[in-house]
Amino acid sequence: MIQIQHLTITHTKDLRELVHDLNLTIATGEKVAIIGEEGNGKSSLLALLVNPKAHFDHLSYEGTINKPDSPQVYIPQQISDDLQSLTLNDYFFADTYDLDYATLYRLADELHFDSERFASSQLVSSLSGGEKLKIQLIRELARPHDIIFLDEPSNDMDLTTMTWLKDFIKHSDQTIIYISHDEDLLSQTADTIIHLELLKRRRQARTSVEHLDYDNYSQQRTDAFQQQIQQAKTEKKAYDKAMAKHRRIKQNVQTTLRNTHDSTQGRLVAKKMKAVLSQEKRYDRLAQDMTQMPDKEDSIELFFSHITPLPQGKYLLNLDKKQINIAPHLTIDHLKLSLKGQEKIGIVGDNGCGKSTLLHYLYQRLSQKTDLTIGYMPQRYDAILPVELSPIAFLSKTGDKSEREVISSHLANLNFSHDEMNHAISDLSGGQKGKLLLLHLVLENPQLLILDEPTRNFSPTSQPQVRQLFENYPGAILTVSHDVNYLRQVCQKIYRLDSQGLEEVEI
């Protein structure tokens, strides 16, 4: 059992609360999902629950976290740099203390990771995002554990592994606390919801806890929101009607008082005015106690404009090659792919089959065209983001005041606070970095977008806007994704990649 009492987490760099007065008891075996918009402090809360005694840059907290001194597993969003430099052999076998080999090999089989690779000299850093997640799950879950902490475990998973993850969480006897933006995963696995919100332009934290599954929580929240709106409107209508009557009475009394010359009558009218003013104070108090319109986090606002797409029939890409090496250890028997000026193509496939490698290969090939402008969004944002700069500095070309004001307005529409616009990009969450890259694409107005898992770090609130953004984009798109909703809404054709090549599929 884990007990959290009056936990408040503050971002010390801009003195802003991320978590406000969280109180929760987590029972053994409970499945707790932490949800919220990008940059709302989900990973900070999870890391603090993993190790309440740790020191965190730019974070302080008040309150208590009591949890049993029992073995636990923590799988972060990204594997650490020191582990990235290891070979697979060292990753799995450099420290074999308390490693259950039977579980290790069983998990490898369940996750379709070839156990012969355990002894490989291949570097962890060379693995795909999905493979890195798999080896973490295999190694960590093969050790004793009573509590499991997962930070966005579904981000890089193929559809087969996602099915495994849902089944694992649902049927596990251990306590599992996890962060996710995947509504399907949430609806099938969570029985308790911690919802982190930042309201009033991200200045006010609201932390909600409900012992409900995700679907019921979402429905209850929607119903309560609508009920509060209706109650606020009803009370406001009654208040406005009462105040209109009160103003008429007050005006009549004021007119009578001004026109009264008899002292006796004047005293009576003055007494009546006193009663009217007393009633006015009661109305003022009533206004303060009225049901307020509910606060809600703003959805993002972003759209492409001023783009002149290439002609529909113009070929941007027309490949038909056999035995093509797109990387030192990746050969495709027959790569056949064409892309026209306004076509939107999606690529799917198992973890480690080479989707991101292929996409980068195509990006490099297409970048050689001098008559084509390309916007590129890799899976790992830091590969192209200058993390030492602020978002405003990154997006600025001239640095003049008017340009910075326009950029600030765009960032505000993506729910960046003033402080977040001016902090280093390295301080941003994964989702905020994703938003920043989206804005960069919009401001560049490219004719072709090459996107690697573009929805992976976005919340359920932001994802519909992201899908709509790319659906309405008038140019061509070449994208890799495991997000079925995104693929169905945006792409006209979808291909599955394996060692044989690309095959058009329906999903």
Label for each model-derived stretch:
Residues L137, L438, V466:
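Hydrophobic anchor residue at the start of the ABC signature
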Residues E152-P153, D158-T160, A424, I450-P454, ...:
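Walker B catalytic motif
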Residues S70-K132, Q379-H440, E444-N445:
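ABC-family P-loop ATPase nucleotide-binding domains
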Residues I4-L7, D14-E30, G63, L319-E343:
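Conserved beta-strand
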Residues L198-Q231, E235, L497-I507:
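Conserved beta-strand-loop-alpha-helix hinge in the C-terminal portion
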Residues M1-H11, L99-Q122, Q220-P328:
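Coupling and communication elements adjacent to P-loop NTPase active sites across diverse families
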Residues K31-E37, S43-Y101, E197-R202, G341-V406, ...:
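ABC ATPase nucleotide-binding domain signature region
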Residues E140-D146, L441-Q447:
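A short, proline-enriched helix->beta-strand linker immediately N-terminal to the Walker B motif
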